[in-house]
Amino acid sequence: MAASVEHRPFTSHQHGVVRSFKSYPDVPRPKKLPLPQPLSDSTNDNDEEAAVWKELVLKSSAGVEPSIFDPRDDGTSDQWIKRNASMIRLTGKHPFNAEPPLPRLMQHGFITPSPIHYVRSHGPVPHARWEDWTVEVTGLVTRPTCFTMEQLVNDFPSHEFPATLVCAGNRRKEQNMVKQSIGFNWGAGGVSTSVWRGVSLRSLLKRCGIYSRAKGALHVCFEGAEDLPGGGGSNYGTSLMREVALDPSRDIILAYMQNGELLSPDHGFPVRMIIPGFIGGRMVKWLKRIVVSNQQSQSHYHYKDNKLFPSHVDAELANEEDWWYKPEYIINEVNINSVITTPSHQEILPINSWTTQMPYSMRGYAYSGGGRKVTRVEVTLDGGETWQVCSVERLEKPNKYGKYWCWCFWSLEVEVLDILGAKEIAVRAWDEAQNTQPEKLIWNTMGMINNCWFRVKTNVCKPKKGEIGIVFEHPTQPGNQSGGWMAREKQLEKSSESNPILKKSVSSPFMNTATKSYSLSEVRRHNNRDSAWIIVNGHVYDCTRFLKDHPGGEDSILLNAGTDCTEEFEAIHSDKAKKMLEDYRIGELMTTDYTSDSSSSNNSVHGNSETTHLAPIREVALNPREKIPCKLLSKTSISHDVRLLRFALPAEDQVMGLPVGNHVFLCATVDEKLCMRAYTPTSSVDEVGFFDLVVKVYFKGVHPNFPNGGIMSQHLDSLPIGSVVDVKGPLGHIEYTGRGNFLVHGKPRFAKRLTMLAGGTGITPIYQVVQAILKDPEDRTEMYVVYANRTEDDILLKEELDEWAKKHDRLKVWYVLQANIREGWEYSVGFITESILREHVPLASPDTLALTCGPPPMIQFAVQPNLEKLGYDIQNDLLVF
């Protein structure tokens, strides 16, 4: 077997809830693991692969909390088994059928630790002793034999390789949301990957002298040890066709080790079948007998489980017409499937100047059966009209017959604004046989092998502090857990059926039939919060009533109010947004008096006044409703990935006109697509004729989560001197007006002390406020800056901040670094913690506000909870740029 995996970093995870436990005797197991000697024909490649697998197993199991005696097993026949408390039980207390939470499954990466590997059991786990266990091979063989475990380990070459196991019911709950099947509610976590070691089934059968096909040896049947009620009492059993069982390319083994350890009780100790590329239901656990026969297994479970019937066949019809015994409906090989794991269910993506700087990385898994390679994975944001091809991380090599047994991981970088305009995200995969996933769910009575497009719905939300965000919703949640868009829509359907008025409103969308025409000059007058009109493709829309609900905030509309914004709207909005826009159409643009936006607009700060009768007022460059062209004057490399860019304003005597705390959009066409990113200038707002930007360049191929790097930052870095970029603004909901006063969403706030927490490039709006305060000698506002970065080289504007802190007592600056700490570093190491904040920022008080800008995880997991511990009301006293 030539399967192999490559190095992959594994992230930590949240521990499950540890419950109190009782003491029960452990199952008797040998003191020493049955580690076979290296094969005589082993190669250095095999040794290297084994070392890689060992490393992967160790990394994947790091941080897994000890299994416990779960109180839910009290009083059951499984009360002697320790289990991981995080596993989601799907069939109540007993029998134990469980899957891990999907985020937990993915956090461990390619190899799934045994304690969180999904479990499928039909009854109680048999008690087993290694020393006493035998596997009988009988039936149509010349040498029937009972093998002990020691014989299986020592008398046969061992085979070890990674393989993905999938329950045929994976994603069944989606089917149950449409119509209840006869199966329980698997989520998308009924899949796991482990490194398995065992004895080749082919070698075992040949050792026992399997008869020829001509002598009737057509099927190889497997029987487990558990006593089950099905069929009036039986063991779990199933079978393979002879050709499959003897096929050397299929790597079928009797496995006795999982991830370098003996099998656990839930996974078949001491020995089980592993049939790569087949559904888990064919892999008999607690294996006791192998019978070569002229007919397939006669087990009740072979016939009454793991079948895929046509959609019209329900359980009653299947029983009446004996569909269970029709061989064409048996499920053997796994089908093609893929799932979105990031974004996770109920994950919130804030929309702000930080999150729009970099694309969002979507992730998930994909697999196929029969050894077929997953050749591509695609994601759509527009219901399948267009598809984007994902990057696929394939961590195994094929075996010598070219077969793949493991899942792969896919990722795709998506612009945040594209997600904002999407109604849903869907994924599909393809394999080398050109199999792909159907768009729509195909219901069947057992709820088996559901593999329709995995869809994640997007909804606009308003997280804390009134920000706009996107909340993601998976179709279902496993077991009896509530949640998921399918459950919500099902409930809405029930409500509409019971309420004729609601049903009519749901099924009869509003149709706007306005045909009135407006002149451009009339549209231009509607350019404020009280009346915000826009022009898109010659149509006039009144967006006033949508201001408060717009996902990007009202400023995004007000920037364009009174103008023709066709280009910008088309660049960043999806088909969903375009359809929504129709509800706000009030008429058409008259073409008879059309002139260009700039020809008749008055951009002067004096408006239509006679300027000769007014005191001199310096011209402001920014116009919220227009892009202004700005030429690149200079470019200075501060470090290997940080640039100081100076841009000229359109006129030498202009100031930028950017309120302190606001930002601007830089607009450029990159690869024939409009790209817009938010930046906060570091130059003083009263500089005349220019503005400065400090830009961190995210290069391609440097950050594993963003292999393509930053589109805009790389574009800016590549610009030659003299190039022109378009700038639009101002934009932002926080404005510092001086001497402790703020306007937040237009409402006044005041503070004598400011707690200022920044991460990475999020320092720029903090820096802007600090700069404004220090320029005013009468502004006595106290500032306490805590600035977190990964390494010292990542700290932006450190010289300026340190110099200001030396000169001004009202500014305190403290740094936190995560890695590459030099000797003599005098600041904090690690992450922003409660103790760091207690030492370096003021406690909460009525005249203290907190300001923050940085990566969303920093704000969510470090800033917000630790400020709360200091007494801050993060709903009201934390301002997020």
UniProtKB/Swiss-Prot annotation:
PANTHER family: SULFITE OXIDASE, MITOCHONDRIAL, SULFITE REDUCTASE. Belongs to the nitrate reductase family. FAD binds at residues 677-680, 694-699, 706, 711-713, 764. Its cofactor is FAD; heme; Mo-molybdopterin. GO terms for biological process: nitrate assimilation; nitric oxide biosynthetic process; sulfur compound metabolic process. Binds 1 FAD. GO terms for molecular function: FAD binding; heme binding; molybdenum ion binding; molybdopterin cofactor binding; nitrate reductase (NADH) activity; nitrate reductase (NADPH) activity; sulfite oxidase activity. Residues 1-46 are annotated as: Disordered. Heme binds at H550, H573. Residues 515-590 form the Cytochrome b5 heme-binding domain. Nitrate reductase is a key enzyme involved in the first step of nitrate assimilation in plants, fungi and bacteria. Homodimer. This is Nitrate reductase [NADH] 1. Its EC number is 1.7.1.1. Keywords: Disulfide bond, FAD, Flavoprotein, Heme, Iron, Metal-binding, Molybdenum, NAD, Nitrate assimilation, Oxidoreductase. Residues 625-737 form the FAD-binding FR-type domain. It comes from Phaseolus vulgaris (Kidney bean). It catalyses: nitrite + NAD(+) + H2O = nitrate + NADH + H(+). Mo-molybdopterin binds at C167. It comes from the Eukaryota.
